[in-house]
UniProtKB/Swiss-Prot annotation:
Name recorded for this polypeptide: Chromosomal replication initiator protein DnaA
CDD domains: AAA (cd00009), Bac_DnaA_C (cd06571)
Annotated spans, Domain II: 74-117
Annotated HAMAP family: DnaA_bact
GN (gene name): dnaA
Length: 455
């Protein structure tokens, strides 16, 4: 009898040896078999999101079938389904059906273009920290890197400033050059495309301009929203897009918003941008911010304890760029003061940050008291272990507010709530943070309580 659970472990071990950590986590970490039919050999597999489902069906199902046959002589029939409790803050737009466009022979690659690349050597998949806010985008980027021109084309990554869009885009470029050193990869800011086009008209070098942009294997365009209201540029980019797409060359774009939200973007460009996949990156949650700081500290050779990393992460909740900037500021302050980096030094270094301007007189017991009164329960219940909803929600909100309105570390907050582990506090914080975006009652309660505690 075929033991699908043992086989799944065997297959995971095979794939772990093949994939790097980022790719393995993207495709296997939250994927699991849920049932197996001994008669039909149908194996139902649960995946986390539509991107993972598409990648498994296109790229991994054949390997799974081959592995099962080699392992036990079983002709496996994998069926993939998306987890019903999948909870992701990113928006994802399902690709429209691909158009049957004629293809032309592949042009010979030109290595000389690679010399002009301005890819940041640090922007690789290995250096990318995955979290709840970027896992869909990371998965899509990995899929594109594995199958350029065929999986999600174009790939459109959107989100706020400093969230990792450029990192993921350039990681695709690095991956292509690793696997195909002679590939022609062009990475540009949208302003570069605009300037190159204008200069080509002035200098009558349109042929060279089109040779540069229409004969590449991978075109990476950052901040595509700057094409807004530029009709001539949009016309030229439309023809560039058409040529590359018809040649099955990969196009990746980033923007601070969806194509439909870019003002005065032509309808035909909006339409073509939606042929592939549009996926959002949202601000990193607390756990991801801590992981980013830890990796950055290791790269800089800094020794920083977990409580201090936790404190720094709690002070910057906007984007990765500002988060890393806060760490640089702490490092510089430690150098000037000739002192080791600890939580007290971090507090002094970051005192002018907005989030540090918290009510230092506010204590966790006061928060517990106000929350308990608001929800008509007791502080003892908030500190207790009851798991009924009437207690769990107020307890999690109290932990969230303790995190938001005081300087207390995660372990300290956990201690104030009956000795709970810091991971429990982190889970509570992230859960309330997410629910505030979808649950009006939770959002109102948190707003009311903040008003009561801050005034």
């Amino acid at each position: 009898m075929f033991n699908f659970e043992k086989f799944w472990q065997h297959f995971n071990d095979e794939m772990r040896a093949r994939f790097n950590e980022v790719a393995y986590n993207a495709w296997f970490k939250n994927t699991k078999p849920i049932s197996y039919n001994q008669k039909t050999h149908e194996l139902k597999i649960q995946v986390q999101n539509p991107v993972a489902k598409g990648y498994w069906e296109k790229n991994l199902s054949s390997q799974l079938i081959q592995s099962a046959y080699g392992y036990a002589g079983v002709e496996l029939l994998p069926v993939f389904q998306i987890s019903e409790d999948s909870d992701t803050p990113e928006r994802i737009v399902t690709p429209e059906p691909q158009h049957n466009l004629q293809t032309t022979p592949t042009r010979a690659p030109q290595r000389e273009f690679a010399k002009d690349l301005k890819l940041n050597e640090k922007y690789t998949f290995d250096n990318f920290v995955q979290g709840e806010g970027n896992k869909l985008a990371a998965g899509a980027a990995l899929a594109v890197a594995d199958s350029p021109g065929s999986f999600y084309n174009p790939l459109f990554i959107f989100g706020g400033v400093g969230l990792g869009k450029t990192h993921l885009m350039q990681a695709i470029g690095h991956q292509m050059l690793v696997e195909r050193p002679n590939a022609k990869v062009v990475y540009i800011q949208s302003e570069t495309f605009v300037n190159d086009f204008i200069n080509s008209i002035k200098n009558k070098t349109q042929d060279k301009f089109r040779e540069k942009y229409r004969t590449c294997d991978l075109l990476l365009v950052d901040d595509i929203q700057f094409f807004a209201k530029k009709e001539g540029i949009q016309e030229e980019f439309f023809h560039t897009f058409e040529t590359l797409y018809n040649d099955q060359k990969q196009i990746v774009m980033t923007s601070d918003r969806l194509p439909t939200e870019i003002p005065d973007l032509s309808e035909r460009l909006v339409s073509r941008f939606t042929w592939g996949l549009q996926v959002e990156i949202t601000p990193p949650d607390l756990e991801t911010r801590i992981a980013i700081l830890r990796r950055k500290a290791e790269a800089e050779g800094l020794t920083i304890d977990d409580d201090t990393l936790d404190y720094i992460a709690s002070q910057v909740d906007t984007n990765i760029r500002e988060l890393e900037g806060a760490l640089v500021k702490v490092q510089a302050y430690a150098t000037i003061e000739k002192a080791d980096i600890d939580i007290n030094l971090a507090r002094e270094a970051l005192v002018d940050l907005k989030l540090v301007q918290k009510n230092r007189g506010l204590q966790i017991p006061k928060i517990q008291e106000v929350v308990a009164n608001y929800f008509q329960t007791s502080t003892a219940e908030l500190k207790g272990k009851k798991r009924v909803r009437q207690i769990v929600i107020p307890r999690q909100i109290a932990m969230y507010l303790s995190r938001e309105l005081t300087d207390a570390s995660l372990p300290k907050i956990g201690q104030e709530f009956g000795g709970k582990d810091h991971t429990t506090v982190m889970h509570a914080y992230d859960k309330i943070d997410k629910q505030m975006k979808t649950d009006a009652d939770i959002k109102t309660a948190v707003f009311d309580l903040k008003q009561m505690l801050e005034h």
